[in-house]
From Swiss-Prot:
UniProt keyword Ribosomal protein, yes or no: no
GO cellular component, one term: cytoplasm
Protein name: GTP cyclohydrolase 1
The EC number(s) this enzyme carries: 3.5.4.16
Subunit and partners: Toroid-shaped homodecamer, composed of two pentamers of five dimers.
Family of the protein in this entry: Belongs to the GTP cyclohydrolase I family.
GO biological process, one term: tetrahydrobiopterin biosynthetic process
Superkingdom of the organism of origin: Bacteria
Annotated gene: folE
Species name: Shewanella denitrificans (strain OS217 / ATCC BAA-1090 / DSM 15013)
Broad class of enzyme this protein falls into: hydrolase
Length: 217
């Protein structure tokens, strides 16, 4: 399947800035990947002494393979990049557009455990405006990968800057990392905040302060 123009532009912009997720070219179809993942997951679970003949476990390798390819890591495949609606700003709207409390679930690329949080995204319209739900879909696409929060924040920013043809975009993410909460230090109360600011959100203190004040969760 040919990639959409939006997917091609966003991927090129991320590669140009060194912000693309480290990944190899695709050499198999989604169904082929599921078969291979299921096989290897069966071996892993067996090495952990789990009895895969038990009716509670026998479908677990298949379920994990499907979950990886179709759901939690679907953002590794630009064939899944959301259909984007960008229109000319004919009404001349020039005030901040902000979408907040965007639910976000990703996966830590170091331990493959959950990152759970909320995102706020804002932009100042110039020549183009974007369908509001498309912002949520872009956040979800990049979250559906093994990630680090810093890169995720920047990927969302660059994607929207590219599609909207403006630098005036801001992204803030607050998230709980289960690699901190459920293992290692086992801190159940801490969270991590990252911001990525472009254009006037970075250069103008008043605009930056307005965004950050309104983006408080």
């Amino acid at each position: 399947m040919a990639l959409s123009d939006a997917a091609i532009k966003v991927q090129a912009a991320l590669n140009e800035r060194g912000l693309e997720t480290p990944m190899l070219p695709k050499t198999s179809t989604p169904e082929e990947r599921k078969i291979k993942i299921e096989h290897h997951m069966r071996e892993i679970l067996t090495l952990m002494s789990l009895d895969l003949t038990d009716d509670s476990l026998m479908d677990t390798p298949r379920r994990i393979a499907k979950m990886y390819v179709d759901e939690i890591f679907s953002g590794l495949d630009y064939d899944n990049f959301p259909k984007i609606t960008v229109i000319d700003n004919k009404m001349g709207f020039d005030e901040m557009v902000r979408v907040q409390d965007i639910s976000l679930t990703s996966t830590c690329e170091h331990h493959l455990v959950t990152i759970d949080g909320l995102a706020t995204v804002a932009y100042l319209p110039r020549a183009k405006i974007i369908g509001l739900s498309k912002i949520n879909r872009i956040v979800r696409f990049f979250a559906q990968r093994p990630q680090v929060q810093e890169r995720l924040t920047q990927q969302i920013l660059v994607a929207l800057q590219t599609l909207l043809e403006t630098k005036d975009v801001a992204v803030k993410i607050d998230a709980v990392h289960f690699c901190v909460k459920s293992r290692g230090v086992m801190d159940s109360t801490s969270s991590t905040t990252t911001t990525s600011l472009g254009g006037i959100f970075k250069s103008n203190p008043a605009t930056r302060a307005e965004f950050l004040q309104q983006a408080k969760f």
